[in-house]
């Protein structure tokens, strides 16, 4: 068994070097300042520990208008990525920015998976950024895997 902890990702109440794996599934990775939560992940991970996190893909972020689902056309400039305001503050760094953020905190990128929907995908009730038609053509989410030395 392992403990599941619900806490502020910018101030995790765990001791240094206490975890082998840190996961964020659209939590800290979207709604917290990336430099702050990635620093916390680096602090609590043991040497060789892995950080796995999901974010909206860069392409879906560029194709989402201020309100409504992703469109087939770009809705904002690439330069607008980073700290963004939708219903609240969200963070959507570019791939290059993620690599820099991870590197600043001692991580190397092991993998980046740009996820698309499968042929039998259906639209979930809770996810309105991109429908399954859009997500079957372009990546709706990015899954990052990073590791400490």
Named regions from a protein language model:
Residues 7-10, 56-68, 99, 110, ...:
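Class I (Rossmann-like) S-adenosyl-L-methionine-dependent methyltransferase catalytic domain
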Residues 10-21:
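A short acidic, Gly/Pro-enriched loop at the edge of an enzyme's catalytic core
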Residues 21-35:
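A short SAM/SAH-binding and catalytic strip from SAM-dependent methyltransferases
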Residues 35-50:
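A short glycine-rich, Lys/Arg-flanked "PGG" loop and its adjoining helix->strand segment in the class I
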Residues 50-84:
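Conserved class I S-adenosyl-L-methionine
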Residues 87-112:
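Short alpha-helix
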Residues 105-108, 125-149:
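Core SAM-dependent methyltransferase catalytic element
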């Amino acid at each position: 068994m392992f403990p599941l902890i619900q806490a502020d990702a910018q101030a995790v109440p765990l001791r240094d070097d206490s975890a082998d794996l840190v996961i964020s599934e659209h939590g800290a990775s979207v709604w917290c300042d990336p430099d702050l939560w990635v620093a916390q992940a680096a602090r609590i991970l043991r040497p060789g520990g892995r950080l796995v996190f999901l974010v909206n893909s860069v392409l879906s972020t560029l194709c989402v208008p201020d309100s409504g689902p992703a469109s087939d056309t770009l809705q904002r400039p690439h330069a607008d990525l980073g700290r963004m305001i939708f219903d609240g503050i969200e963070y959507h760094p570019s791939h290059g920015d993620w690599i820099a953020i991870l590197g600043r905190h001692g991580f190397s990128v092991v993998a980046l998976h740009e996820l698309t929907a499968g042929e039998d995908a259906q639209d979930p009730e809770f996810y309105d950024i991109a429908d399954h038609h859009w997500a079957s053509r372009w990546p709706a989410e990015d899954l990052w895997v990073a590791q400490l030395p």
